[in-house]
């Protein structure tokens, strides 16, 4: 495919960032970095250490010394903290409820941005997970603050109805009215909290918006690949499932 490719994908909760980003990475043989999982891992670590999440200085210090290892395989991404696989634990309701307190800490954001940029840069070298082919990185701030010079930058959006249904399926295994209602506060509160420290609801200059409200997963992956080809001028691969 030629030179290393960095693809940055941002968007609100439930827009499909993770599934689409993993799918794009699998199609193109790239590494996959879930920056949101890094904030969740930081939250797990702080709670594991017994930190008061309201103590911003203590939380920032804890995150600076956090022994975090991100597995970048899009077919099975992993998250380890201090040798513990926290991939399932960081998706718990406890972490989902607490993560905003960590993610809105500006010193934490600065530290995790540093780590994220280091991963992205490493994936442009032959020693990276994908052998220098590049990375798909997804999450808050990724298109504007973390990787504003990415080869392709996408803002993935969807209607509130579609986002709530997707997150309900993800968390509860169903998108019936009760599940959607149970998920609504968590999704909208996270977006509201994150909006105080990052811009992810309106595309910045050079960022292409893809609305997935009426698209299924494979169609959305195709749409993102089309954007990558459009903005890079590179044929990035066949348009079929992995």
Mark where each language-model region is.
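Pre-Walker A (Motif I) flank of P-loop NTPase domains
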Residues: 2-6, 131-133
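Hydrophobic anchor at the beta1->P-loop junction of P-loop NTPases
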Residues: 9
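Hydrophobic positions on the alpha1 helix immediately C-terminal to the Walker A/P-loop
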Residues: 20
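ATP-dependent NMP and nucleoside kinases share a basic, alpha-helical "lid"
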Residues: 87-173
């Amino acid at each position: 495919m030629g030179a290393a490719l960095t693809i940055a994908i941002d968007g609100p909760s439930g827009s499909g960032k993770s599934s689409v980003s993993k799918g794009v990475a699998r199609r193109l043989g790239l590494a996959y970095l879930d920056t949101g999982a890094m904030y969740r891992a930081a939250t797990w670590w702080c709670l594991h250490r017994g930190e008061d999440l309201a103590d911003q200085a203590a939380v920032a210090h804890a995150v600076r010394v956090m022994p975090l290892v991100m597995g970048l395989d899009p077919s099975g991404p992993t998250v380890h903290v201090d040798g513990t696989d926290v991939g399932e634990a960081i998706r718990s309701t406890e972490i989902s409820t607490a993560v905003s307190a960590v993610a809105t800490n500006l010193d934490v954001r600065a530290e995790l941005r540093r780590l994220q940029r280091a991963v992205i840069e490493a994936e442009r070298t032959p020693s990276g997970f994908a052998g220098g082919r590049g990375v798909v990185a997804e999450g808050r701030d990724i298109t504007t603050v973390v990787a504003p010079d990415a080869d392709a930058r996408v803002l993935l959006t969807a209607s509130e109805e579609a986002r709530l249904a997707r997150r309900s399926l993800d968390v509860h295994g169903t998108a019936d009215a009760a599940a959607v209602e149970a998920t609504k506060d968590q999704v909208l509160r996270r977006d509201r909290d994150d909006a105080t420290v990052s811009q992810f609801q309106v595309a910045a200059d050079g960022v292409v918006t893809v609305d997935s409200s009426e698209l299924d997963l494979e169609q959305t992956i195709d749409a993102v690949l089309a954007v990558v080809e459009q903005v890079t001028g590179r044929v990035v691969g066949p348009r079929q499932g992995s």
